[in-house]
Amino acid sequence: MAEAARQELENQLRQTIETLVEISLLVHDTTGSQENKEGLIEQMDTLVKEFQRLKEIKCDKQIPIDVIDYIDQGRNPDVYTREFVELLLKQNQFIHGKMDIYTVSKGVRESTSDDIPLDISCGAHSNTEISTNPGQKRQGNVS
């Protein structure tokens, strides 16, 4: 049923666009004659009826306001879609990179957990013995 409503909406939109084109041609080529005025009034009535039919069509599709703004500015909505998809791809790559770094760092932490003690005390020690040779000891000041 949703497909039928979408098709009906598309057909009605096409008819409305055709009526708008006919109105623009009538306005552009107007001679000011009574016949021309009556034709324009008739097309305007048709346009109003087509807008009413558009309003009556039930369609559960929501159009983002950004897309409507694009159309109002005379831009192609496909450009909006392409730019939106490119932005999502960049964000996805960024998040994927963060996840990869976390996985690698977690692996490094796990592989070095035996080598590095968890409780490392830091501080200044005076007169700490520093060994330069395994058999020789000397006094040094580490700060």
Curated annotation (Swiss-Prot):
Region described as Disordered: spans on this chain: 123-143
Keyword set, alphabetical order: Activator, Nucleus, Transcription, Transcription regulation
Domain of life (superkingdom): Eukaryota
GO cellular component: mediator complex
Keyword Protease found: no
GO molecular function: transcription coregulator activity
Stored Pfam families: Med10
GO terms classed as biological process: regulation of transcription by RNA polymerase II
Location within or outside the cell: Nucleus
Biased composition (Polar residues): 124-143
Subunit and partners: Component of the Mediator complex.
Family affiliation: Belongs to the Mediator complex subunit 10 family.
Primary role: Component of the Mediator complex, a coactivator involved in the regulated transcription of nearly all RNA polymerase II-dependent genes. Mediator functions as a bridge to convey information from gene-specific regulatory proteins to the basal RNA polymerase II transcription machinery. Mediator is recruited to promoters by direct interactions with regulatory proteins and serves as a scaffold for the assembly of a functional preinitiation complex with RNA polymerase II and the general transcription factors.
Name of the protein: Mediator of RNA polymerase II transcription subunit 10
Native organism: Yarrowia lipolytica (strain CLIB 122 / E 150) (Yeast)
Gene: NUT2
